[in-house]
Amino acid sequence: MSPKRRRHRTRDTEHVARHEEEVGLGVGSAAQRYAAYKAEAQAASSLRARWVSTLSFTPDPFQIQALDAVEAGSSVLVAAPTGAGKTIVGQFGAYVALEQGMRAFYTTPIKALSNQKYLELCDLYGSDNVGLATGDTSVNSGAPVVVMTTEVLRNMIYAGAPLDDLGVVILDEVHYLADKMRGPVWEEVIIHLPAHVAIIALSATVSNAEEFGAWIREVRSSCEIIVSEKRPVPLYQHMIVGEDIFDLYAPTGKGKLNPELVAATRDSEMRGGRGSR
């Protein structure tokens, strides 16, 4: 075949392919449409879809990614600013465990936060399904979902407590692992939990999230790392000088101190004021 005839044949083939694509008859188009339909049907019937339908808001992309990872049974590390919505990932983990007939442990670093999460989960799943176990309080500790301090879970592991029916552990405020005094507790829990237990680690934004997630993946065999730096709730910083409150930074100029604050501080120092804080 001459080069000229080959070029004509190529142009004709491309024209037919474009026409078939436009009318939906291209190679693989039927398979692609079926695959898309099947994926949509599966998504609509998923636990995630049912959970999301109960929410009063539309989850952000990072939340959807985390929910899908949880439903797939993978461990997941979610690092996002305070107020970004990490909590619903932990709540969904408890929901999945309940739907699958497994137990879920929701751990926090302090008793006050455990009490708060206990009340939140009671509102979601009913007090019959939620328990509380801290150092000095035990409420319905045999419930399918139990809120506890991380130390309580560590002690359960070392005491050989039966965990065969435990499906997931939510580690709230997992960035405490970097704490010199209490960090080893989180480390021991992550390392010594039974292999079948998935971990949902919720953390404030940290600089080494990828490294942290890689370590969890190393000791737990799987971990999806999801990082969001979007702060939906604005963070404002102020300073009080005497009886007045000032914005810490100028409205324009990133990182530049508020000139009114600087002037007020100097004036206070000149007058020997000691009221700045």
Task: Tell where the protein language model's regions lie, with residue ranges.
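Conserved interdomain linker/interface between the two RecA-like ATPase lobes of SF2 helicase motors
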Residues: 191, 198-200, 205-277
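SF2 helicase catalytic motif II
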Residues: 146, 150-151, 159-201
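Helicase-associated low-complexity/disordered flanking segments
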Residues: 1-68, 72-75, 234, 254-257, ...
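Residues immediately C-terminal
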Residues: 139, 173-177, 208
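Conserved nucleic-acid-binding Ia/Ib motif block in the N-terminal RecA-like helicase ATPase lobe
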Residues: 102-155, 214-217, 224
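Conserved catalytic network of the ASCE P-loop NTPase/AAA+ motor domain
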Residues: 70, 96-100, 123-125, 137-141, ...
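A short beta-strand-to-loop transition that corresponds to the Sensor-1 phosphate-sensing loop
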Residues: 82, 110, 148-152, 173, ...
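Conserved SF1/SF2 helicase motif Ia
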Residues: 79-82, 89-116, 194-196
